Amino acid sequence: MNQATLQQSGKGYNVATVGNLSTFEGKAFLKEIIGTTSMEVSFGSLAPGQSVPFFHHHKQNEELYIVLSGEGIFTLDGNEINVQSGSIVRIAPSVSRCTQCTGSTPLVYICIQAKEDSLTQYTMTDGVIEE
């Protein structure tokens, strides 16, 4: 299993790495390493034929999965959804979910969790252009 490591930090920022994604295995949670305060971020990798060993849902957090490489199936409330490199999947807290790698190469993804309905400012309303 890969571990995230902090590379650099300064006032208001942290930089970390999980290493080479082509050799990444397992799961690495980043919240504690990078100090996020409004979300959990993790990298995950499933080997060919491997699946998460349980179905689960969340109490408050929605999840956003960004598939970086590989192919797989997300089973969402009993519906099988095929995913591949470039797929983006948003899952509400109450939806039962499980992920499986169906390709010949690992399924590598980023998962971002944040409290559902908590976003009040976003790029165009929160960003400030500096001169």
Predicted regions located by residue number:
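Short acidic-glycine-tyrosine-enriched beta hairpin
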Residues: 78-93
